[in-house]
Amino acid sequence: MTKPIVAIVGRPNVGKSTIFNRIVGERVSIVEDTPGVTRDRIYSSGEWLTHDFNIIDTGGIEIGDAPFQTQIRAQAEIAIDEADVIIFMVNVREGLTQSDEMVAQILYKSKKPVVLAVNKVDNMEMRTDVYDFYSLGFGEPYPISGSHGLGLGDLLDAVVSHFGEEEEDPYDEDTIRLSIIGRPNVGKSSLVNAILGEDRVIVSNVAGTTRDAIDTEYSYDGQDYVLIDTAGMRKKGKVYESTEKYSVLRALKAIERSNVVLVVIDAEQGIIEQDKRVAGYAHEQGKAVVIVVNKWDTVEKDSKTMKKFEDEVRKEFQFLDYAQIAFVSAKERTRLRTLFPYINEASENHKKRVQSSTLNEVVTDAISMNPTPTDKGRRLNVFYATQVAIEPPTFVVFVNDVELMHFSYKRYLENQIRAAFGFEGTPIHIIARKRN
C-alpha cells in the first residue's frame, strides 16, 4: 500500500524546512536563514488524524550549478511529478514576489491539488497581509507560523481533504515484491534484464540513462514475484535528472512498496559511501534485504577471493549483518540461481511469527546465560516478551524500567532470538516497555 505523497514547494527562505520538521515531528533537515541551505533528509513520514502520508521538502533537492530560477522551476516540477498534494509556501514578511508568481504558473498546469500556505504569520496583526496572496489563484491562503507552530492544524486538514481512497493492493499477498536499489551504474537494469530473460529496460553505460520503469510480474520455480524496477529513477530530459537526492526519492518510494530489497553493489569498483547510504534507506524502512554483488565476472579470483569480498561487505555494512550476500554477473547471466533462495528465505522470515511460550523460553535462557545489567544498584528485570508485528518481526519486552535496558543488552537479546529462530534476511525490532 503506497501512502499519499505531499510536497512542500516554494522559493528559498520561505520556511519549507521548518514546516517539514514541524509536520514530521523531528528536526531532520538542517535549517538556517540563508537561502539554499537545506541539507540531509528531504523525505519523511507524517501523520494527521487518521491519515498517514509521506512528505517531501523539495528545497533539499539541489540542481548542481543551475541558475536560481532554474532551481526553483525544477523543484516545482519534481513536486508535480511525485506528489499527490502540493503545499505551496510563501512568506508574508516579504510579500508576493516574482518568484512566487513563477512557481504559481508552473503549479497551475499540474492539475494536482495545491494548498497555499502563508508562513511567518507570527501575530494577529499580520493576518490582514495574507489576503494579498489570493491573487495567486489557489483559493484561501492558510496563515501559519512555522517557528511557533501556529495554523498547522487547519493547513493539514486542508491537505488530507485531498487524499483519495486507499488503493487496493493489486497483488496477491503471497507474491514477493522486489525492489532493486543501488547507486548509478552498478548494473540494476542489467540485473532486471537477466532475471526476466529479456531486454525490457534500455541499458547504456552512462550512469542515470535508464528511463522510467513499471512493475513487472515474474514467476520462478512456482513463486510469484513483482519487480519494482527502481533503475528508472531518473527522468530523461529533465534539469534535475543528475541529482542524487532526486533518485533517492524515487528509490524510497519503491522501497516502501517492497517486501524484499536487493541492494546492488559493483564488485569491480568496490564499496563506497554512497552504497552504504542507499542500503541504509532499506534498513531504516525495516525491509528484508539481500546484498547482490554484481559484475563478479570482472574480478580476478582465487579460492579466497569470495571470502575476502564477503568479509569486506560485512565490515562496511555492519547494520545489514542479517542480510545474505549473492555474487552474480548480470551481464553474463551467471550465478543468478543463487539469488532466489535468499530472496524467498528473506521474505518468509520477514513474515515469520513465533509462539510466545517458545519466545519466553529463549529469553529466559538468554538471561540465565548473561544476567541483566544493573545501574546504580538497580537491576533490569525482564518479565516477559511477545511478538507484536511482522514485516519486520517486532517484539515487545516488558521490563521494570525502560532506562535500564541498555542498547548492548537489547542487541544481546536480538542475537539470542536470531540464534533460536533464524530470521536470516530480515531486521528484527525489539521494543522495551514498562510493565504496568
UniProtKB/Swiss-Prot annotation:
Q: Which InterPro entries match?
A: G_ENGA, GTP-bd, GTPase_Der, KH_dom-like, KH_dom-like_a/b, P-loop_NTPase, Small_GTP-bd
Q: Which UniProt keywords apply?
A: GTP-binding, Nucleotide-binding, Repeat, Ribosome biogenesis
Where is each KH-like domain found? 352-436
Q: Does the keyword field hold GTP-binding? A: yes
Q: Which Pfam family is one of those matched by this entry?
A: KH_dom-like
Q: Can you give the residue ranges of the EngA-type G domain?
A: 4-167, 176-351
- Could you say which residues bind GTP 1 here? 10-17, 57-61, 119-122
Query: Can you tell which superkingdom this protein's organism belongs to?
Result: Bacteria
Q: Which family does it belong to?
A: Belongs to the TRAFAC class TrmE-Era-EngA-EngB-Septin-like GTPase superfamily. EngA (Der) GTPase family.
Assembly and partners are described as:
Associates with the 50S ribosomal subunit.
Q: What role is this protein assigned? A: GTPase that plays an essential role in the late steps of ribosome biogenesis.
Q: What is this protein called?
A: GTPase Der
Q: Which gene encodes it?
A: der
